[in-house]
Amino acid sequence: MKTLPEDFRTYTQALMGEKLYQRLEHAILEEEAPTSIRINPFKCKDADGEPVPWCPETGRYLSTRPGFTFDPLLHAGLYYVQEASSMFVDMAIRQYVKEPVMMLDLCAAPGGKSTAVRAALPEGSLLFSNEPMRTRSQILAENVQKFGHPDMIVTNNYPRDYKKSKLQFDVILTDVPCSGEGMFRKDEGAIGEWSTQNVNNCWQLQREIVSDIWNCLKPGGILIYSTCTFNAHEDEENVDWICEELGAEVMALEGVEDTWNITRNLTGTDFPVYRFIPGVSRGEGLFMAILKKEGEWEAGSPAKENRKDKKKDKKVAKGKGPEIPDGWLKTDTEWMPAESNETVYAIPGRWKDIYNQAEKNLKVLHAGVKLGTDKGKGLIPDQALALSTMLNKDHFPQVELSYDDAIRYLRKEAVNLPADTPKGYVLVTYRQVPIGWEKNIGNRANNLYPQEWKIKSSHVTGELFIVNSL
């Protein structure tokens, strides 16, 4: 049985008041968390369920929690399982970002907020998704590749590295490491790790993170500060510190409905903040504030300098070094080939200078479209290419898999192809959606699904129909 730390109970009750705290405690100890997903609008047209009110275009509450692991369309990136409170970032982006921007998600793993942000950003924007912890950065890269949008760069760096890089951003999301009080309901381990000392360590670290990244935010730029915790030390007090020490201004969001039951400032200060409390609002714990840096923001596409004196043709770029194979990608974008450790990428040409600056100064894990690996006998197509929204799938032979065969494929088991399947690389699909590659060598086919991504469970729940593809 869950037991909440006494220091947490005493402090939080004093902060929230008896009534609000009792609703929180009851939710943590007695209630099931709601199940919600967010669809990928670049791959998916709709989903079952009730719209999440602060993210109505892509967020959905589900009435039950299905076995998501056994839905091939989850692995194909058509949707992401995300608790509803975290989708509030969608509202912030849509309200404050009306023109193309360059944005940084500084502490992005596992990628839920990054993919939510990418879906909400105006076309022509570039998103850097960064995770400082090496072990967590790989799952971030995986989820970004499944999402499949080309205007994203994934890095594994500390804030100080970005400071040295001289890259400048219009918007920065700092979903900072925290004491995790908002995770108590769904993660009992978070309860065991909580302590007042950890809270103290966190609020100090959070200030260091914001301070380190502040110079990377352009004058007039937007900082979205968020935690998944409740205490004011990591929340309101840090927002107040950002205003006092760094000169930021707290901004309000319009259209936040009273029926959403989002709790506002609990410290008596008058700046607007947004706190999601389980048992009060329909989601897990989240705190968010929108801050504006002093100065005038200079409007315009972040890629405008890269477009000067460029020809307006749509041809795939070619030249010395790696090349992008003809026909692999949609040709409504000008592509620049790039290579790193035998892996070839296609970078949208408008980001050439920015990508080169990132590659020079940061540890780039993924950028644009990951095409494949060059072993000297031509490119072996990568899983990320199969899941990219830029894939020209009609260029490749395709085999539609049954549900059972799709699950076998995602377990990296052998899947037989029809006898008339051409030799070479074959795009396998499920419900007409690409899920990966096989190499047909005649008497058998090699499953090219990434070993580290495979489904490990032998259990199967049966075919799911949660979302509808484009």
Predicted region positions:
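Polybasic, low-complexity RNA-engagement segments
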Residues: 1-45, 63, 294-470
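Class I S-adenosyl-L-methionine
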Residues: 169, 222-225, 230-353
